[in-house]
Curated annotation (Swiss-Prot):
Lineage: Eukaryota, Metazoa, Chordata, Craniata, Vertebrata
Keyword Membrane carried by entry: yes
Compositionally biased residues, Basic and acidic residues: 1116-1125
Annotated PANTHER family: CALCIUM-ACTIVATED POTASSIUM CHANNEL ALPHA CHAIN, CALCIUM-ACTIVATED POTASSIUM CHANNEL SUBUNIT ALPHA-1-RELATED
Swiss-Prot/TrEMBL keywords: Calcium, Cell membrane, Ion channel, Ion transport, Lipoprotein, Magnesium, Membrane, Metal-binding, Palmitate, Phosphoprotein, Potassium, Potassium channel, Potassium transport, Transmembrane, Transmembrane helix, Transport, Voltage-gated channel
PTM entry text: Phosphorylated.
RCK N-terminal domain: residues covered: 361-503, 735-879
One GO BP: potassium ion transmembrane transport
Locations listed in the record: Cell membrane
Source organism: Danio rerio
Parts of the chain on the Extracellular side: 1-39, 154-168, 215-254, 311-321
Residues bearing the modification Phosphoserine: 661, 674, 678, 874, 878
Protein name (Swiss-Prot/TrEMBL): Calcium-activated potassium channel subunit alpha-1a
Cytoplasmic-side segments: 61-132, 190-193, 276-289, 343-1184
Length: 1184
């Protein structure tokens, strides 16, 4: 056959051809093809023969197999028909066997074909390491083959290539040999050979592998259908899943969409590149156009997007026909895939990723209840400037993305705060925030949730998840309910020694309120001490000026200098206050067994050890450094405390590992209190102290305290025994008591009244000092709480409502020492402004009541009550002579009240005469400054305070809970009730711990300092004489005016300076010893003792509740009480034993009021006329 060669390069030039000839244009690009003959059909034929030949063989095999099955089925039917006549043979061993069993036996054996098939399945399965490696390798080689195609696409579609000289052809050959072997494994492992043959991956192999072998044989290369390798990209998501790179559904879906879109795009571009560069076969390939592969990619994109610029278009008929069909499918794919891809990318977690730790910088993880309010409160305290330089990064982890306000807050603190979206219950998210290298994990609770138990359960699950991931991580979590703390003890890796802490908001809130019942305003002072507040300077002489000066003080810890070693605590305390301008209130003391405990104002017998940690009240952390730097040789003559800095003396502290910031020493210094070493404020064994005689008699058969000796205890009482009707309450003289107004019903969450009662029943009070507690509220609710209250003495219940004035008058609310208003319904209301409506209404209701001041006095005197100021039996130099007692009031506004609030902004409704702005922070409002309002939000600062020093939380709990210990918590977790214990020297020693009291300056041993005296002189005198540590003033709001005022409201001044001038109406906050005469000499003790006491006994007269007639089991004791009442002005009480068995019903319910004598009436009138001049002091004899 003759060939006509046309040397014209113009593709449009006409050529003369015969019908039977195949004429192709010759160009220098194909120099080896002297004839100009194309061999594309040979490459294509190899693929088509392989595909259709294999398909024919498979179909033929299936047909033959089907026919064979039909034939075998007919034979089986014939055999079943013969089975009836088949005899059963009996073998020698006695078994029977038919003839067919010989044929069925081999059927149960596995043939070699099945074994090979299983082996091939394991080889290509991603379930094994070999299979995963093979699958990933095939995918990688497919992408490599596609890359070779991209390189070769710049060459002509068909060209002559020498296999031994063409490097890319050799590599492609090696890839395809591997593909052929892998195809064989897949074919062997396939269960359905027909469907396998029609799979996309199989079709790709048919049209890419055989042409390579043809290329070697013909020494030609045809670009052909090698672009089909792009279809392997569809498996990209599967490969990433095999490698555990893709784990979420969104990421898998995104990769799937992208891989399908890109593979379809590249494959279609490859087909257009082939037909446009080759031309139409029926046009003798003369209508081709030179297009690069990437121009075809561009053409397909503008076609799918329906833009169609027209700069590049298809000229061949095959290309145009393909574009017609592709635009239909491509447009649909583009319109559906691209928006979905963009949506998935746009919806990807903005706060995904992982935390990158910075060398030399710690980080903490904060999770739980993450809201704008909780985060802002936390950051405000954690990053406060008074903490010095906080080189800690805060990583927040929450499963909900932050709103715009919270996001803005994070951006304002971007240098120290990062946010990641995720859950601590997911180990993957814990790995993202590097929880294993975090310094601590803090879990915030939702204080306003409707179901506190559910919230606690969520936080406990978070603790379990975190501890399960990394058992050594330190966790500080907030808990809402006290009884849920016990569940944390069930976590094996929960370790108090390593700094794990649970801040129970209900326990601390109730403890703060209970301490206010003992010393009004103390809750405000303590809340301010453990919160970081900036100093706000006010020039005007207003009460806010003095209040804010005290607010700037906080609690810090620092190691004491070696200059203090060997000195007693009062000596060191005085030196720190006078010289260093620091207030030392407690130390961490190590016993001989190297067990550490926190001692609050321990007394003279405790000497400072080397490396003793002190708890200071100061305005910032830099001031506290003075206690560490103080050197007697260098700083003894310095009067300006600011000049006390590190000196050049060789001191032990230089070698002490205390170069850390004082905020972090406790956690890294290993001085954490162990769970077995309870923070009992034990100073000494009372049996071993000189001057404290041993107990003469000890009744071991009487249980008066719980098993730890920390609380007064009584046998369980049925609730019916303590219920008072309104008439019974009216006939029962109640004075100096605590009225607890509680709102709640059957469905309300429990507030945990035990946490309120326990501090009021601490064993460092004598029995007669215990204030009776009267609960006024729903009986249905109180029944639910009673299980935790039935072991406490002097607790009564008046069923009713706090909004009923008749109920309030029945309990003599005008004679109470404190009225507490609580609500268990606060979190069930969605509107935040209405959450406190019940408490606010009850508070305003009480303040608007009016009372006749004579009624309470008459009732009290008829039952043995001495009006405040009439009891003058204590010596003038006794410190209890100045202890505060509430005088009779005539208006409800003078009743001491503390109201619990949920919403801070509602504090504006408590006082109608204040001018507080609704946006004013809680601590700046008048009710909070006066100690008449308390909100749980003030406890948020304890999270950061506990992180920087875990002993701070121990100190707080010891101060406000009355001495709750880890042992007691473990006991309550087991029995949910206090267990009584016999009095032993060890348990009695636990009573010897200090307590908070308020001291009046109008009368008593400090009266000379009350009128214009300096606070520092009072501080030193009280400390030296009575070991009494003063730490604040409770002052009348208008005292600075210097003129008499009708306002009886007071406010708190924390840690006044030495030269602060006092006024006679001031009340002093002080830490009082259990034995308040411990600081006096023996002569003073003898003088302070009552003359009727034995010389071996010390007087322990202290302020107490109003005394009523007590019923004793002994008639002799009853006669002594009667004699005492008859000679009340002398207060000559009989000698008492330590372990007097007090009657359970110390307060009779039904008492007839006797007619008052003329002598008593004169005393009452005298009291009424001089009540404003007599200081509110009253004492009774010590019961213990």
């Amino acid at each position: 056959m003759s060939n006509n060669i046309n040397f014209n390069k113009n593709p449009d030039s006409s050529v003369s051809i015969s019908k039977m000839d195949v004429i192709i244009p010759f160009t220098p690009d194909v120099p080896c093809d002297n004839n100009g003959q194309r061999m594309w059909w040979a490459f294509l034929a190899s693929s088509m023969v392989t595909f259709f030949g294999g398909l024919f063989i498979i179909l033929l095999w299936r047909t033959l197999k089907y026919l064979w099955t039909v034939c075998c089925h007919c034979n089986i039917k014939n055999k079943e028909a013969q089975k009836v006549n088949n005899p059963i043979t009996i073998q020698a061993d006695g078994t029977t066997k038919t003839g067919n069993e010989k044929e069925e036996a081999p059927a149960s054996e596995v043939g070699w074909m099945t074994s090979v098939k299983d082996w091939a399945g394991v080889m290509i399965s991603a379930q094994t390491l070999t299979g995963r490696v093979l699958v990933v390798l095939v995918f990688a080689l497919s992408i490599g083959a596609l890359g070779i195609y991209f390189i070769d696409s710049s060459d002509p579609i068909e060209s002559c290539q020498n296999f031994y000289k063409d490097f890319t052809l050799q590599i492609d050959m090696a890839f395809n040999v591997f593909f052929l072997l892998y195809f064989g494994l897949r074919f062997i492992a396939a269960n359905d050979k027909l469907w396998f043959w029609l799979e996309v991956n199989s079709v790709v192999d048919f049209f890419t592998v055989p042409p390579v072998f043809v290329s070697v044989y013909l020494n030609r290369s045809w670009l052909g259908l090698r672009f089909l390798r792009a279809l392997r990209l569809i498996q990209f998501s599967e490969i990433l899943q095999f490698l555990n790179i893709l784990k979420t559904s969104n990421s898998i879906k995104l990769v799937n969409l992208c891989s399908i879109f890109i593979s379809t795009w590249l494959t279609a571009a490859g087909f257009i590149h082939l037909v446009e560069n080759s031309g139409d076969p029926w046009e003798n390939f003369q209508n081709s156009q030179p297009l690069s592969y990437w121009e075809c990619v561009y053409l397909l994109m503008v076609t799918m997007s329906t833009v169609g610029y027209g700069d590049v278009y298809a000229r061949t008929t095959l290309g145009r026909l393909f574009m017609v069909f592709f635009i239909l499918g491509g447009l649909a794919m583009f319109a559906s895939y691209v928006p979905e891809i963009i949506e998935l990318i746009g919806n990807r977690k903005k706060y995904g990723g992982s935390y990158s730790a910075v060398n030399g910088r710690k980080h903490i993880v904060v999770c739980g209840h993450i809201t704008l309010e909780s985060v802002s409160n936390f950051l405000k305290d954690f990053l406060h400037k008074d903490r010095d330089d906080v080189n800690v990064e805060i990583v927040f982890l929450h499963n909900i993305s932050p709103n715009l306000e919270l996001e803005a807050l994070f951006k304002r603190h971007f240098t120290q705060v990062e946010f990641y979206q995720g859950s601590v219950l997911n180990p993957h998210d814990l790995a993202r925030v590097k929880i294993e290298s975090a310094d601590a994990c803090l879990i915030l609770a939702n204080k306003y949730c409707a179901d506190p138990d559910a919230e606690d359960a969520s936080n406990i699950m978070r603790v379990i998840s975190i501890k399960n991931y990394h058992p050594k991580i330190r966790i500080i979590t907030q808990m809402l309910q006290y009884h849920n703390k016990a569940h944390l003890l069930n976590i094996p890796s929960w370790n108090w020694k390593e700094g794990d802490d649970a801040i129970c908001l209900a326990e601390l809130k109730a403890g703060f309120i209970a301490q206010s019942c003992l010393a009004q305003g103390l809750s405000t002072m303590l809340a301010n001490l453990f919160s970081m507040r900036s100093y706000i300077k006010i020039e005007e002489d207003t009460w806010q000026k003095y209040y804010l000066e005290g607010v700037a003080n906080e609690m810090y810890t620092e190691y004491l200098s070696s200059a203090f070693v060997g000195l007693s605590f009062p000596t060191v305390c005085e030196l720190c206050y006078v010289k260093l301008k620091l207030l030392l209130i407690a130390i961490e003391y190590k016993s001989e067994q190297r067990e550490s405990s926190i001692l609050i104002n321990p007394g003279n017998h405790v000497k400072m050890q080397e490396g003793t940690l002190g708890f200071f009240i100061a305005s910032d952390a830099k001031e506290v450094k003075r206690a560490f730097f103080y050197c007697k040789a260098c700083h003894d003559d310095i009067t300006d405390p600011k000049r006390i800095k590190k000196c050049g003396c060789k001191r032990i502290e230089d070698e002490h590992p205390s170069t850390l910031s004082p905020k972090k020493k406790q956690r890294n210094g290993g001085m954490r209190n162990s769970p077995n070493c309870s923070p009992k404020m034990m100073r000494h064994d009372p049996l071993l102290i000189p001057g404290n005689e041993q107990i003469e008699s000890m009744d071991a058969n009487v249980k008066r305290y719980d098993s730890t000796g920390m609380f007064h205890w009584c046998p369980s009482k049925e609730i019916e025994k303590v219920i008072l009707t309104r008439s019974e309450a009216s006939m029962t003289v109640l004075s100096g008591h605590v009225v607890v107004c509680i709102f709640g019903d059957v469905t309300s969450a429990l507030v945990g009244l035990r946490n309120l009662v326990m501090p009021l029943r601490a064993s460092n009070f004598h029995y007669h000092e215990l204030k009776p507690i009267v609960f006024v509220g729903s009986l249905d609710y109180l029944r639910r709480e009673w299980e935790t209250l039935h072991n406490f003495p002097k607790v009564f219940i008046l069923p009713g409502t706090p909004l009923s004035r008749a109920d309030l008058r029945a309990v003599n609310i005008n004679l109470c020492d404190m009225c507490v208003i609580l609500s268990a319904n606060q979190n069930n209301i969605d509107d935040a402004s209405l959450q406190d409506k019940e408490c606010i209404l009850a508070s305003l209701n009480i303040k608007s009541m009016q009372f006749d001041d004579s009624i309470g006095v008459l009732q009290a005197n008829s039952q043995g009550f001495t009006p405040p100021g009439m009891d003058r039996s204590s010596p003038d130099n006794s410190p209890v002579h100045g202890l505060v007692r509430q005088a009779s009031v005539t208006t409800g506004s003078n009743i001491p009240i503390i109201t619990e609030l949920v919403n801070d902004s509602n504090v504006q409704f408590l006082d109608q005469d204040d001018d507080d702005d609704p946006d004013t922070e809680l601590y700046l409002t008048q009710p909070f400054a006066c100690g008449t309002a308390f909100a749980v939000s003030v406890l948020d600062s304890l999270m950061s305070a506990t992180y920087f020093n875990d002993n701070i939380l121990t100190l707080i709990r010891t101060l406000v809970t009355g001495g709750a210990t880890p042992e007691l918590e473990a006991l309550l977790a087991e029995e949910n009730a206090l267990r009584g214990g016999y009095s032993t020297p060890q348990t009695l020693a636990n009573r010897d711990r200090c307590r908070v009291a308020q001291l009046a300056l109008y009368d008593g041993p400090f009266a000379d300092l009350g009128d214009g005296g300096c606070y520092g002189d009072l501080f030193c005198k009280a400390l030296k004489t009575y070991n009494m540590l003063c730490f604040g003033i409770y002052r009348l709001r208008d005292a600075h005016l210097g003129a008499p005022s009708q306002c009886t409201k007071r406010y708190v001044i924390t840690n006044p300076p030495y030269e602060f001038e006092m006024v006679p109406t001031d009340l002093i906050f002080c830490l009082m010893q259990f034995d308040h005469n411990a600081g006096q000499s023996r002569a003073s003790l003898s003088h302070s003792s009552h003359s009727s006491h034995s010389s071996s006994k010390k007087s322990s007269s202290v302020h107490s509740i109003p005394a009523t007639n007590r019923q004793n089991r002994s008639s002799k004791a009853r006669e002594a009480r009667d004699k005492q009442n008859a000679t009340r002005m002398n207060r000559m009480g009989p000698e008492k034993r330590w372990f007097t068995d007090e009657a359970e019903n110390a307060y009779p319910r039904n008492i007839q009021i006797k007619p008052m004598s003329t002598h008593m009436a004169n005393q009452v009138n005298q009291y009424k006329s001089t009540s404003s001049l007599i200081p509110p002091i009253r004492e009774v004899e010590d019961e213990c």
